[in-house]
């Protein structure tokens, strides 16, 4: 944590000679997809980034959804299990407590151990789990099926709440 305010935006503008906007990755993804990508021409969309956590960027009626504190669309904090794991922000059952990179790896290690197979978290990255699933590994296949179910729960909640024109999914886990 920085102990003083650093004018990053102004420093970047001066160095680049261009206007700079600072935002989180999911909002930037949503804006780019809306203006130039898969969401071009749509008036509403939801972008989900799947990586270390689950991020979100939302466009509604041709406007980025920001919220009162500019922190709307923190979709990783959406609960999918009302009695689930308690996360670092105090919410229970937040989806990113189940399908973020680290959580997937930890769950895979646990499931492999239950089958008598010793794996480290470094051997259970999304890429490793993808390769294992493509090779027919039942543990990896079930883990991805469970991940898809949880992601589907989040998407259905968003669908019934926002009724967007599209959902666009990206990020390291999504690859």
Give the residues covered by each predicted segment.
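A cytosolic small-molecule/anion-sensing beta-strand core signal
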Residues: 60-61
């Amino acid at each position: 944590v920085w102990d003083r305010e650093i004018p990053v935006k102004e420093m970047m503008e001066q160095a680049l000679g261009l206007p700079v906007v600072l935002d989180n990755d999911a909002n930037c993804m949503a804006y780019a997809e809306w203006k130039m990508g898969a969401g071009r021409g749509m008036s509403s969309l939801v972008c989900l980034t799947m990586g270390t956590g689950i991020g979100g960027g939302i466009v509604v009626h041709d406007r980025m959804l920001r919220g009162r504190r500019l922190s709307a669309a923190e979709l990783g904090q959406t609960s999918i299990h009302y009695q689930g794991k308690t996360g670092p922000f105090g919410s229970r059952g937040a989806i990113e407590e189940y399908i973020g990179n680290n959580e997937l790896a930890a769950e895979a290690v646990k499931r492999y151990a239950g089958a008598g197979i010793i794996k480290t978290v470094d051997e259970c990255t999304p890429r490793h789990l993808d390769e294992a699933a493509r090779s027919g590994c039942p543990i990896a296949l079930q883990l991805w099926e469970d991940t898809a179910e949880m992601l589907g729960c989040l998407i259905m909640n968003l669908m019934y709440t926002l009724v967007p024109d599209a959902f666009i999914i990206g990020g390291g886990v999504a690859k």
